[in-house]
Amino acid sequence: AHLFLKLSDNKNTAYFYDLNTKINYKVNENNNLYLSGYFGRDIFSLSESLTNTYGNSTLNLRWNHLFSDKLFSNVSLIYSDYYYGLDLNFIGFNWESGIKNYNIKYDFKYYLSDKMKLNFGTNLTYFDLNPGTINPLDENSSINFKQLDKKYALETGWFAEMEQTLSEKLNFSYGFRLSTFNRLGNSTVNYYANDQAVVYNEDLKIYEKGTPISTKYFGKNKSIADYVNFEPRATLAYEIDENTSVKASYNRMTQYMQLVSNTASPTPLDVWTPSDNYIKPQLADQIAIGYFKNFSKGDYSLEVESYYKKIKNRI
């Protein structure tokens, strides 16, 4: 993209950079520590009037423990930070938004036999969302500082999955994930008549914001709304020969974060928001079938997959 930008008469630039690091430390025969980090940014500048910067930062500390030759575990502490920035120099302000995640994961692998393996564990994620911050670029700007209310949420999950070899050619895996989600305070919540935050105007044929009938302040970490969802999943794989296999699967997925947009297509100012009283979690049921074949001793492969997905509560 940067090569084509050079052909323009304007001073347009586009570039990105990534930094990765990983450190391993063997404590003893049964314990290992792993530390990894990532920092990346994509930057696009249009004729010095607009600069778009976005990227991710992550830090992961993992402890691997071997209980026996059949059972081991991983404990992970994960921090991630998604940043989005837009400098509108021709107007005189900067827009920033982002999501910070603090995640703890504890998972196990237990080899019950040569033909059965059990995976299970739990995780907890705390979300710190900044929907938007408007900063004037200089003291003479006509734009005033504005901080949209930050949003907080807590998601927990428990999962179990059995991987089973039914025969030399047939493998079956099945399990579930049980997730809970809490939208947390520190914010004031509006309440609307008939719980309708958005109403349809029959005369204008458009949706309009509802009129609040009351408000309530929720203190920090107080629960505003909560959800519980059961997510089953199963996969059946059959090996026709050493180079050919077919697979069928079903799984249910829950997404508690939704992308809010004022338009039909994504824009730079779209923001992520957690589920609450009025924005329900997005649920998806998916069925998939696939055909896989290797050629020339694995140098080439053919993969054909088809799926049907039913989505509920999408906004």
Name each region found by the language model.
Residues 1, 35-39, 75-81, 120-126, ...:
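Transmembrane beta-barrel strands of outer-membrane/channel proteins
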Residues 14-133, 299-303:
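Outer-membrane beta-barrel domain signature, strongest for Gram-negative TonB-dependent receptors
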Residues 21-25, 61-65, 104-110, 158-164, ...:
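Residues on the lipid-exposed face of transmembrane beta-strands in outer-membrane beta-barrel proteins
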